[in-house]
Amino acid sequence: MVPPRRHRGAGRPGVLSSSPPFRLRSAKFSGIALEDLRRALKTRLQMVCVFVMNRMNSQNSGFTQRRRMALGIVILLLVDVIWVASSELTSYVFTQYNKPFFSTFAKTSMFVLYLLGFIIWKPWRQQCTRGLRGKHAAFFADAEGYFAACTTDTTMNSSLSEPLYVPVKFHDLPSEKPESTNIDTEKTPKKSRVRFSNIMEIRQLPSSHALEAKLSRMSYPVKEQESILKTVGKLTATQVAKISFFFCFVWFLANLSYQEALSDTQVAIVNILSSTSGLFTLILAAVFPSNSGDRFTLSKLLAVILSIGGVVLVNLAGSEKPAGRDTVGSIWSLAGAMLYAVYIVMIKRKVDREDKLDIPMFFGFVGLFNLLLLWPGFFLLHYTGFEDFEFPNKVVLMCIIINGLIGTVLSEFLWLWGCFLTSSLIGTLALSLTIPLSIIADMCMQKVQFSWLFFAGAIPVFFSFFIVTLLCHYNNWDPVMVGIRRIFAFICRKHRIQRVPEDSEQCESLISMHSVSQEDGAS
């Protein structure tokens, strides 16, 4: 028997056999598997690290947001207390000096203090001194102030948001390409390549700085600058003055109606009837809509009807004053609520976005036009006999000044600050808290006794205001219409599946069941 022929170099050390290298190929495949396993473990570890870092950052940002929310709620509650105290102080002033027109004129004229911003605030002052910069000079001044402040990296980094770490996956790595299956191909040396980090850090620029950063990357043609400024820039001082001139009379009449109502009836009744301004706003916004949230729905209509029923119960409630004076005070309160609704709806149609209008400048011009244009009303009311002009004494004058500075100038600023810290919805809901606070104040200070009709009417007014605010927030939600549709569908479905008893003569089978059963048995 001839032994098998031995290949050359088969038993020598250091010499590879010419037979298929199964051992080398298995080692190569095991190395690839170990590399894939190592890459998978590294990716999983990076994902865990990313999750931990993002979790820590979200907790820090959430804590900051909770602090802002808590501060905003405290400020709004403080505003409610100021407004109730202002109403009580106004009622006290009217017992000594019953001049609603003088009180309204003095308080509204104190808005002119906001115009001191042209002396204190540099962008306002530059709108008047830099006429060559164009009608949007204030915007360029804000941009220059931003670029001057952001000259260091520390200032820029402090304005950025918290870092967010996101894993990066490179799809074009050579290791992810399929390996060659050719056995005879020699192993090629690895090429040197740049290795990037598998984690990407993301920071967001604040919205207040994003616009200036965009302008810095744009060219200088006037048309491009003008188009971007018309889109996102604030209104100029001239435009704000024109809007203030139009709304000066509406604002004054609304506040005059409120002061007249306070001179005729209790503070609680005035505040409850004045809270219906949100419902009048709903009706006017449906007629003159400014956005999709002004859509009229059946749920909002039922809330308005509920509020009207509460207003009727409030007017039927007895009080210490004569019924005629309470009726006049209720009419003044409703008139003030309607005028305030007209003011809100029209200013929303005039200004498409709230950030375009400088609120302190707006109120400052309202006070200025009120001071310059409405002073002839003293002569008109004096000679017609509606309100005799008489200068108040020192005590009453001091009360009017304090009430105007705190209850008008300061409270408006605090309310806007609270809305910025929380939201406009929470700020609107906070206005309704003046109703129970005013009731408690009337019971404690003036010893006013209200019947059960008053509380039975106050609850629907407060509840309907809350419902309308909630429905305006969810502008596409109409639960009443959805419920009616479901009930109608349920009733129609029950009628459709219900069968009427029939006689045996009226029923006829097209296929004989006996024949069908026989065919099934034969098969």
Swiss-Prot record:
Entry keywords, A to Z: Membrane, Phosphoprotein, Transmembrane, Transmembrane helix, Transport
Main location per the UniProt record: membrane
Keyword Membrane set for record: yes
GO cellular component, one term: membrane
Domain EamA: 252-316
Positions where Phosphoserine occurs in the chain: S207
Membrane topology: Multi-pass membrane protein
Tissues expressing the protein: Expressed in colorectal cancer cells.
UniProt keyword Plastid, yes or no: no
PANTHER family: SOLUTE CARRIER FAMILY 35 MEMBER F5, SOLUTE CARRIER FAMILY 35, MEMBER F5
Family from the record: Belongs to the SLC35F solute transporter family.
Functional note: Putative solute transporter.
Protein name: Solute carrier family 35 member F5
Record organism: Homo sapiens
